Amino acid sequence: MTKAEFLRWESDDNYVYEFNDGILEPTTGMRQDENYLFSTLENTFFQTASFRSGSRLRPEMDFWVTDKQMRRADVSYFTSQQIQQMNTGQKAIPGFVVEFASHTDNDVVSITKRHEYFEAGVQVVWWVYPLHQEVHVYTSPKIVTICTDNDILSAAPALPELKMTVAELFRK
């Protein structure tokens, strides 16, 4: 499938698709049991100056990591300037993304996505493991901080004012 065909195509099944150099890659979208994680993250974000200035967290927003590759992180952070650019048809790369790991994920795909994100310009990736209530915070493909319990999660340098503990993220 060409990129142009993909852009016109609409899925008729229950998958969300990413595009990788002509290949459609089915992924699962954010599940209902992950909604509380997004809501907690979003509610914390609502308290920031970035939110008040028009920046936004977007669930399942597509973005092109290369001219041939489109990804959809579970959550992406776009500045108000990036949102204005997108509104005029320009492409934007989020500075911060969150992926909620599921039992269907495999390490090869996860590692590949992290590398793609950083190569595209993403500054921070949170890989959230709900089953273990653990978050891996990447600031590069090689630098990771594993957080649990009352460890502080930070979206710095992309969004330094967004901070919360792992326990707060997982509180229902």
Residue ranges and their predicted role:
Residues 1-172:
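Gly/Pro/Ser/Thr-rich low-complexity, intrinsically disordered segments predominantly at protein N-termini
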